[in-house]
From Swiss-Prot:
Gene: tmem229b
Keyword hit for Transmembrane helix: yes
Region of interest: Disordered: 158-189
One Pfam family recorded for the sequence: ABC_trans_CmpB
Organism: Danio rerio
Primary localization: membrane
Protein's name according to its UniProt entry: Transmembrane protein 229b
Lineage of origin: Eukaryota, Metazoa, Chordata, Craniata, Vertebrata
Length: 189
């Protein structure tokens, strides 16, 4: 009798990595859009710093913990306000630390409502919207991901050839009904 293995949730490090890449990508896209809106630059040059990987990955991982603690206690509007306040605190703290080493990649000194050039009130609405998107799309879907033991596409195809999967068969080892598998990740519905 074969033993079935239930796909495991992603580790904190795996989730951190996904959050870091998400934040990094969004930073590049935001700066490209900003450059277009402000300077009408059709090249859409998006920029960021490698520090953004650590900053966004850690920030969103902490927001994930907040989400898990707050989801049954308060509505999404209040949660997003809390996330936005946290984002300001995190941006100020990491910016202040990086500035000590002349490594802070942003400077909001030209904004009217900035504080020490590290945070600016003008970004309250974008941070709030980003918080909503992070909770509703990124965190909730990342928490649904499971890592399947069969990660190599060749192994999965071999199982299909041997009748270990495919139509009517299991999708991944121990995968639940309604789950889909691709590249070793199982998304549980």
């Amino acid at each position: 009798m074969a033993t079935t293995v239930t796909p495991e949730p992603l580790t904190a490090l795996s989730r951190w990595y996904l959050y870091a890449i998400h934040g990094y990508f969004c930073e590049v896209m935001f700066t490209a859009a900003w450059e277009f809106v402000v300077n009408c630059n059709w090249k859409f040059p998006g920029v960021t710093s490698v520090w953004a990987l650590f900053i966004y990955g850690t920030c969103i991982l902490i927001v994930e913990r907040m989400y898990l603690c707050l989801k049954d206690r308060c509505n999404v509007l209040l949660r997003c306000i809390i996330y936005t306040l946290w984002t300001y605190f995190w941006e100020f703290g990491t910016g202040f630390l990086l500035r000590q080493f002349n490594a802070c990649p942003w400077d909001y000194s030209e904004f009217k409502y900035n504080f020490m050039g590290l945070i600016t009130a003008e970004y309250a609405v974008p941070w709030f919207c980003a918080s909503f998107i992070v909770e509703r799309l990124v965190i909730r879907n990342t928490l649904r991901l499971r890592f399947d033991e069969v990660a190599e596409s060749g192994q999965a195809e071999e199982r299909l050839d041997r009748g270990g999967g495919g139509r009517g068969g299991r999708r991944g080892r121990g995968a639940r009904a309604g789950a889909t598998s691709a590249n070793g990740y199982v998304k549980v519905d």
